[in-house]
Amino acid sequence: MKAWASTGRGLRINNVWCQQRLLHPLPSRDDTHAIAFSSSPGKSDPEQEGVTGPNKKHSDLATIKQPTSGIRRQDASSSSCFAGRGSSGLEGCRDRRRPLRSYTNISLELAVGGPLTMVPQICHPVKARQPLVVHEWNIFRSIPSTFILTEEGPPRCHRFLGTELSYSSHPEIPIRIPRCRIRDAPLPHSPRITLHGHRNSGVPQRSAARSPAGTNGFIIPPWNHYMYEPECRLTRLCGQAPHSRVPPCGACAPNTTRSTRGVAGHIAKGLSRIVEPPLWIVILPPKRILPLPKGEPSIHYARCVNHFMIASKAATSAEKWKHHHPRFRRYHPSARARSGFMDQSFEDCSASLCYVSGTRPEIRKVRARMVGDPLLTGTPSEELLAATPTTHSIGLSAEDKYRSTAGRPTSRSARTILPRDDDVSNRSYRISASIHYCGECSKERNGLYRMQHIPRSSCAKTPARKHGGTIRVARDEYGPGVFRAPPPTPAEGRALLLIGVRRQGRTNWYSDMTRVDCVANHLRRERAPHTRCR
């Protein structure tokens, strides 16, 4: 198994970790399994537990027992191997006395010039990626716990790197959905660029010699065979940002475009203001995954403590993100957009707790913003021609008999023909999720007109009738002036369905709705004359 961790020799942990739990609970059992790459897949191994014949044949993965408590303790005596300088800490970590897959702790001090953290690396042979529907990966129950370990931080670990996963080894359904649309796109679960600021971390002087002068933080990229351009090039481009440089083990590619360099520079500069004090120790990904094919969509992902930012450019990328977001939130309801996040200075982007994507048609800038922080950056980029589709949402409502194919609501009798109350709630949930297809950053007035009738969230002959009557868009009841009102502040706790910001004679539309009943409550409050937006 390729999994690396610091030895912790002479290391005092005085800082307090800002932890961000993922959406999976940590397994209570102590005999959690760790997934590893088997160097001899054809041989029978008693340690390969839970891997059946077909899966074992096609995946070349082995399951090795590793107690969770042992990973958390990270005993220094269990580290018995050092990575060589010539391999940049990625290869050459095998002890002749023990097989490669038996390792769980390997120090990278010699490779990067300082103590690092645990890096679970789940490898897969470089082959043509097989469809996920071929195999069911339910036997790999420990992959979510691996992410949690890297997030929470064992008490003896100092810093944390990313995680390498093959395309076909991730068992989570919510991750399969976006990967069908964006191949191995980064998410809060997946490999990420992780930034942590530590005070009194006790970094040795030799580590500071390899990093920018006067800095004491770090930025580490993930290693993933299927990363897109920003994930694998951002670290090299950080050398163009102020007060940062690339270590001697690599250099910036000569054919790197100026726009990508600017994006990386702005991200590095902006995050350095948040992480105090700033530091950029850059570790390069393997050269064998660079460069990536030209013309691939670009998704910029950055993270700082509990702040996430995903900025996407190119029409196909932005379009796919908008299709993915409601599905992601359906499986992870806790990752909801913050109400009232949009403001006039950020009208060119669509933002939520999970992603930031520029989607204004014919836009010449990609604007990125950290969630919960006033940071706003911009850099020249490609054109974004991402118009929000409405046909799919209207089609879903038509299938459920809530409206016609033209977008008009159906009669009450048609809406009340439902066999069970569960069908009512399920269909209402599907509709609230499908509204994101139409409302999220919709710029076309015709599309908004077709979505003016928000379907009833209740039916006359079911207990769900208590939610109220038919909800229509605010324009029908309050006129077009409501769309030019400024978004509410988070303290007000209101949920707007559609937000429009006027700029240079053009209105940009946004949606910040998570549930239909939230919009209904907001509309009820807006019925009062003194609260009506003008």
Swiss-Prot record:
Keywords (A to Z) from UniProt: Chloroplast, mRNA processing, Plastid, RNA-binding, tRNA processing
Q: RNA-binding: present as a keyword of the record?
A: yes
Q: Which GO terms fall under biological process for this protein?
A: mRNA processing; tRNA processing
> What molecular function does GO assign, one term?
RNA binding
Q: Which GO terms describe its cellular component?
A: chloroplast
Pfam family of this protein, just one? Answer: MatK_N
Q: Where in the cell is it found?
A: Plastid, Chloroplast
Nucleus as UniProt keyword: no
Residue span of region Disordered: 29-95
Functionally, this protein is described as follows: Usually encoded in the trnK tRNA gene intron. Probably assists in splicing its own and other chloroplast group II introns.
Family affiliation: Belongs to the intron maturase 2 family. MatK subfamily.
By what name is this protein known?
Answer: Probable maturase K
Gene name, please? matK
